[in-house]
Regions:
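Active-site microenvironment for binding and transforming phosphate-containing groups
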Residues: 1-182
Length: 182
């Protein structure tokens, strides 16, 4: 939610996004409020999200760069993404030694952001049964209508994604972001 911050107007009140036109000093105050109220051990590693397949190792890259995923293998490193309609995905290994967060919109999912993040962050030596994933709040299929460009892009990459699309009329489908992420 955005309750409890200091932003006003259309950004009211706990806006954490520095990319939407809110005053940067107010966004910084909101981010400090988040750290304090959530008892975070450090400021999150904020990213410049670009709806693509790139991720960064947050315990190595201190400054946020253009990426849609961040992971850490060190304690007290906070990974974060911002979402509205897009799907936030939280990942960790069963031992809790590695964590990741992914900003997964249709472009990122279609370009393989989840697969690439898992490969980079966990490596190929960890079996899939050792990975835990949580899918956060995102736009649901009843509210997400897409055209053939999105559908065709997904099916070209992953033909098994046909269950992510329900045709509502000629050239328009409801898109299930959750099903496509699974």
């Amino acid at each position: 939610t955005r309750y409890g911050g200091v932003s006003v107007g259309g950004f009211s009140s706990l806006n954490l996004g520095d990319h939407v036109g809110d005053d940067s000093a107010i966004v910084a105050r909101n981010r400090n409020i988040l750290v304090e109220r959530a008892s975070l051990p450090a400021q999150p590693r904020w990213l410049v999200q670009v709806h693509g397949p790139v991720g960064v190792q947050a315990d190595v890259n201190v400054a946020g760069g253009e990426a849609d995923a961040a992971w850490a293998q060190s304690p007290n490193v906070v990974c974060a993404v911002l979402t509205a309609d897009c799907l936030p995905v939280l990942l960790c290994d069963r031992g809790g030694k590695q964590v990741a967060v992914v900003h997964a919109g249709w472009r990122g999912l279609c370009s393989g952001v989840l697969d690439l993040t898992i490969d980079q962050f966990l490596g190929v030596d960890i079996p899939p049964t050792e990975i835990l994933a949580w899918l956060g709040p995102a736009i649901g299929p009843a509210a997400y209508a897409v055209g053939s460009v999105v559908k065709d892009s997904f099916l070209a990459r992953e033909p098994s994604c046909t269950n992510s699309f329900t045709q509502v009329r000629s050239g328009i489908w409801q898109f299930n972001l959750y099903a496509s992420a699974r």
